[in-house]
């Protein structure tokens, strides 16, 4: 069963099954670990930043409906909070242009702190911005 984007929380586990539409994609960059790019994705409940690696950068475009299995929502290099396939996950194109979506809230813009009662869990501690600061909404 798919989880809505509004319900994902940071974790160091590959356990997210979801689907979304890619709204926008940044130009790929090349680092020591290979090619990567960020994308803005959304479903009917929220938006999120997606990290695409290697061939994923070329495989997906704005308007694509994507299914993510065994995804992970975590900080990349202790800075950006992104949803990604990781080493054990998989992204697959399901179709194009046939899904309702919202651009707010953007769950990548939520501030999260470790739960004092359980260090494996995170709790919300505020919102940096309701919209993506990387992919600002059109006026």
Outline where the language-model segments fall.
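Short, charged beta-turn/beta-strand-edge "cap" motif at the junction between a beta-strand
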Residues: 71-77
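OB-fold nucleic-acid-binding modules
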Residues: 1-30, 56, 77-139
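Short acidic/polar mixed-charge low-complexity motifs
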Residues: 46-48, 64, 79
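Hydrophobic residues positioned within well-ordered beta-strands of beta-sheet architectures
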Residues: 18, 39, 68-69
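OB-fold (S1/OB) nucleic-acid-binding surfaces
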Residues: 21-50
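Short nucleic-acid-contacting surface segments enriched for D/E, G, S/T with interspersed K/R
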Residues: 54-70
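A short beta-strand motif that forms part of the nucleic acid-binding face
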Residues: 43-45, 54-56, 72, 85-87
